[in-house]
Amino acid sequence: MKVRRNIDLKNQKISVEWISFIKPIGKSPRSRKSVAGEHFSKDFYRQDLKNGLISSYTRFKPVTDCMFITAEPGSFIYTSKTDDDEVCGIFFLAGPDQKVEINFLTFDIPCEHRGLISVVDGWELNGEVFPSEMDHRLPLKQRSSEFCGKNIGAKRSFTSSQNAAVIRYRIPKPGKGFTLFAKFLKNPRPCNVLAASVDEPYTLRNYGRRINCTYVALYPGTVHVIALGVGVSNFLGATRTTETGTLRKCDESSPHDQVIIGGSDGLDTSKVQIVDSICGIDSKPDYRELVEYGVTSVRLVSSGFYENSVTVQVQPLKNELLDANLSI
């Protein structure tokens, strides 16, 4: 299923292509409505909260779909209206140079009714998480937090490592739910980025670090390399000024500093099918590559000896072009 959402993020129109559902634990997701506030018990919105954050629920945006995607910060509310035990999710997508901070203001999740909330540092698709374990400083087990119970007044906070975060929840008890406040924070050195725009170029950088960083788009795409600088200057400041042009098949000649272009059917970057790998210094590369997979990825591999960067634009592959290539 393809879902297109046009989102206004800080006055910038962002077109996002989503091509697959999240695969939840248990039953398959389906759209459902919730009613904000009216089913909550009275003490859920007690007026004696000293922080003054819950003076009124009218300013909270209701979570209305089982798969709720937003590129906007703000206050959100979810209230269960059925005893259905399906797992649903709230998916936050910030700008490429931002992180997501999630603050649970109140929650009433009955553990005795198998209620549960899980916050994931990353984006989840079909049971796989981006960034994958090989590209993140923490193992997957340490990137998620689960809890249930009841808490009024004291906040519970989580901050993502990149511009994507997911809340998974199962609340099979009518009238129960949660409120939260999401903020988008500046990320001074973004590494792994989920594409939020099909039009805007993005520059992956290693900032001199020994690190692997990946730019992922959730659609088959045409990767246009706008600028390439892999091996420009080392950590001592020595600079190459001679352009080499775009060198190809660098996974064989220069595996420690390269750009891997590929695709996969999921978000696990260890399963990416490599279409090409490039390196070198090229200020005006004439390079485009088609990636005919559901997920398009551009991965910058860095040894830490160079200030590496690559600027790319990943545009959705047109259906007629995709069909023509698949028929060859």
Regions from the PLM with identified roles:
Residues M1-I328:
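Domain-level representation of secreted and single-pass membrane ectodomains enriched
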